[in-house]
Each structure stands twice: as structure tokens, then as C-alpha cells.
């Protein structure tokens, strides 16, 4: 399994089982609110981005009431600060590239906190465009391994634009060009297969291997970013090994 697919699978399992569900659901609620505002409709049948975020929410067992509240907030019901999306680019120890995607109601506060995490952990915040050229946005869909086979899934998703399928013990990870996300999910649902997760993810064109000590420092920074309330996603070009995941 590739480093990216391995890491995506680990993060998916963590989201499904993490004891800190409240923080995960809070982040997804922001994504739902933004999806409604940007997609222009609270109806997932008319809003592809919202439809995909709801798939992600259900994959973490987010209660329907929480999902509905976030949709209403995005549609203008209730109070709530304006949430903005932005990205920060930088370097971690060993020259590893990192992109941090955030959804925040206070970009000055968030920028200062992101900069602090970089600087206090051997990294540095860079200007926009410094590392983003090393990544492409991809559709990544997770399917339960139980009851499915690689061959049967290939027959379903290749015509929908998927490029690759990889498997670990519990899930199949399907990847394809960013614009194929909805078509892959729709093709699976048409065959009665419910994805556990479906989202657009930044994937590095090439990964890099560095000294294990530096790699552990990079994993620490990634963990700090992922624990930040405003961070929605973290991408890196570090080659994620089994040893690092087990740490």
C-alpha cells in the first residue's frame, strides 16, 4: 500500500473511533456550513460538495441532528460567525513540505497559531505557492473491505473515472482525479455500496524519505496541526512508513 493510501486509511480509522468525537464533528460541521454557502443549496441532491461532506460525516457516525444544524447554519438560519477557508504552506524538519487547510472565523488568530506550530517544532511557514506545486488534489473514497473485492469494485469505479484501488485489512481506498469524486460515489451507491468517506485530498506527486528522527518530528507537527480546532486537513510529501504510523 502506498504511503498516501496507508496514511489516509489510518486517519479514516481514527475519525471513526476517536474518543474526541466532539472535535471531529465540530470540524465537519464547519465543512458542511461552508459547503452549503459555496454550493448555493442546502439540498445535497443539488449540491455535490455538500453531498460528499455528508458522506464523510456519516462515516464518523455524526448524529443527524448535528448535520441538520450545520446545514441550517450554512443556509442562514441561526447565529454564527462568517467562516473562511484558506491554506498555509511550509516546511517541516528535513525539508518536508506541508500544506495546512483551515476553516476559521478569525484568520489573524489562526495564522499566528499555525506559524507558531511551525516555528516551535523545527519548521517554518512559507509563502503561498512555495510547496503547493508538489501536490495534486485527488478524489479519495473509502469503502468497507468486508463484502467487497478489488475486482468487483474495479468493474464499478473504473468507468466512473477512478485511477487506482488499494486495500488494507478494513477498507479499500479508491483514488481518481478531483472532478470524479461525485461520479465514483454515485456509481458505488447505484450498486448498493455506501462509502465510509469521500473527499478531495491533496496528494504529493512524489514522497520523500528522511532520517527517522526527523520523520518523527514531522509526524509530531502533523499531529499538532490535526488537533487544532481550525484545521480541516493536512497534506505532506513525507513517505509514511509503518514504523511512523505505529509511533
From Swiss-Prot:
GO biological process, one term: regulation of DNA-templated transcription
Record keywords, A-Z: Cytoplasm, DNA-binding, Transcription, Transcription regulation
A Pfam family: TACO1_YebC_N
GO MF annotations in UniProt: DNA binding
Keyword Cytoplasm set for record: yes
Presence of the UniProt keyword Transcription regulation in the record: yes
InterPro entries recorded: Integrase-like_N, TACO1_YebC-like_2nd/3rd_dom, TACO1_YebC_N, Transcrip_reg_TACO1-like, Transcrip_reg_TACO1-like_dom3, YebC-like
PANTHER family reported for this sequence: TRANSCRIPTIONAL REGULATORY PROTEIN YEBC-RELATED, TRANSLATIONAL ACTIVATOR OF CYTOCHROME C OXIDASE 1
Protein family membership: Belongs to the TACO1 family.
NCBIfam families attached to this UniProt entry: PRK00110.1 (NF001030), PRK12378.1 (NF009044), YebC/PmpR family DNA-binding transcriptional regulator (TIGR01033)
Protein name, entry field: Probable transcriptional regulatory protein BHWA1_01533
Organism encoding this protein: Brachyspira hyodysenteriae (strain ATCC 49526 / WA1)
Lineage summary: Bacteria, Pseudomonadati, Spirochaetota, Spirochaetia, Brachyspirales
Amino acid at each position: 500500500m502506498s504511503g498516501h493510501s496507508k496514511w489516509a486509511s489510518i486517519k479514516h480509522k481514527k475519525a471513526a473511533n476517536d474518543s474526541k468525537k466532539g472535535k471531529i464533528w465540530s470540524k465537519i460541521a464547519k465543512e458542511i456550513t461552508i459547503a452549503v454557502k459555496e454550493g448555493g443549496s442546502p439540498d445535497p441532491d443539488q449540491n455535490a460538495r455538500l453531498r460528499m461532506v455528508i458522506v464523510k460525516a456519516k462515516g464518523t457516525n455524526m448524529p443527524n441532528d448535528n448535520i441538520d444544524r450545520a446545514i441550517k447554519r450554512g443556509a442562514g438560519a441561526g447565529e454564527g460567525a462568517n467562516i473562511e477557508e484558506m491554506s498555509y504552506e511550509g516546511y517541516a524538519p528535513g525539508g518536508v513540505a506541508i500544506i495546512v487547510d483551515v476553516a476559521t472565523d478569525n484568520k489573524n488568530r489562526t495564522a499566528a497559531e499555525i506559524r507558531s506550530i511551525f516555528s516551535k517544532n523545527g519548521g517554518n511557514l512559507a509563502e503561498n505557492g512555495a510547496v503547493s506545486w508538489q501536490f495534486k488534489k485527488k478524489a479519495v473514497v473509502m469503502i468497507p473491505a468486508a463484502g467487497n473485492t478489488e475486482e468487483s469494485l474495479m468493474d464499478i469505479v473504473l468507468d466512473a473515472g477512478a485511477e487506482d484501488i488499494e486495500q488494507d485489512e478494513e477498507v479499500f481506498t479508491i483514488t481518481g482525479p478531483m472532478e470524479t469524486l461525485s461520479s465514483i460515489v454515485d456509481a458505488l451507491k447505484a450498486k448498493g455500496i455506501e462509502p465510509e468517506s469521500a473527499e478531495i485530498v491533496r496528494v504529493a506527486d512524489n514522497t520523500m524519505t528522511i532520517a527517522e528522527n526527523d520523520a518523527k518530528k514531522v509526524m509530531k507537527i502533523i499531529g499538532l496541526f490535526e488537533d487544532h480546532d481550525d484545521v480541516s486537513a493536512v497534506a505532506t510529501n513525507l513517505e509514511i512508513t509503518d514504523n511512523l504510523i505505529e509511533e
